[in-house]
Amino acid sequence: MPSKKKKYNARFPPARIKKIMQTDEEIGKVAAAVPVIISRALELFLESLLKKACQVTQSRNAKTMTTSHLKQCIELEQQFDFLKDLVASVPDMQGDGEDNHTDGDKGPRRGRKPGSSGRKNGGTGSKSKDKKLSGTDSEQEDESEDTDTDGEEETPQAPPQASHPPAHFQSPPTPFMPFTSPLPLPPAPPGPSAPEAEDEEDYDS
């Protein structure tokens, strides 16, 4: 049997919305249409927020949207003013990041050198800086799902890491030490072993 591919459903669940509404003691019964309308309103709101944030991300020549991009979008758009408290703790976009984008190939190298690790995917300079700002697993998974160009960009990352001398990680060879037991073994009793050796010789002959 062919496996059915699960259809991606991005709708906000009306049943969950209804439960959230009913947690308020002042709300009694909820008509069936109300959670559906709220679900659609949430979709439209999220669509407008993400479109604006996408514009900010693209203006920075970044491939991954980060919390810093969302923060800048919320601060720029007056209609999102009510979200400013949510992003107050998010670090601002660095002004130096814009200079790295105009430098071309120099940007990614500068972004990766301080504190880079072998796990990070390659990309533009802003991408590596954005990854430092956003440490969530979901954002890193999103980067692993990017197009094949990310796989090609990983190869330039190898030379900067290869420039670090690997000899520092090798430990000097230790001299061979035979295993010695911390407890002394008792010597075998000499009496019974002698007749057994004679018996074994009889079987051989």
From Swiss-Prot:
Signal sequence residues: none
Domain Histone-fold: 14-77
Stored Pfam families: CBFD_NFYB_HMF
Keywords: DNA-binding, Nucleus, Phosphoprotein, Repressor, Transcription, Transcription regulation
UniProt feature, compositional bias: Acidic residues: 138-155, 196-205
Biased composition (Basic and acidic residues): 98-108
Post-translational modification summary for this protein: Phosphorylation reduces DNA binding, but has no effect on heterodimerization and TBP binding.
Region (Disordered): 91-205
Cellular component annotations (GO), alphabetically ordered: negative cofactor 2 complex; nucleus; RNA polymerase II transcription regulator complex
UniProt name for this protein: Dr1-associated corepressor
Subcellular location(s) per record: Nucleus
Organism expressing this protein natively: Rattus norvegicus
